[in-house]
Amino acid sequence: HVKINVYIADDTFMAAGGGYKCSININDIQEVQLFNEMPKDNFTRTNGGSTNEYDIGNYKGRTYGKCMLFIWDGYSPVLMIKSSNKTVFVNSKEDGYIKQMYEKLTDYHK
């Protein structure tokens, strides 16, 4: 049974699940964006897990390039976080959680 955890701890954005982990220092975040659904970008899995329930791990998108996904299929919104060397997409099964995360991260950048 796979779990995906997305949280902020000690000024670091963390996403973990299925044996994959991504951490970005909040000061290194260059862009935070909220999407109604996962962008259609022909993502190709380079090293990760994919079922009809989730997509986790390392992927490559046509527009976004190398990125990490911690995505439950069929859940929205989707949060994209970009630093100089990483792009990560996350969502949650918990209603309102990702919007809250988005607001927290954009507050840091005011």
Per-region residue spans from a language model:
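Conserved beta-hairpin
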Residues: 1-26
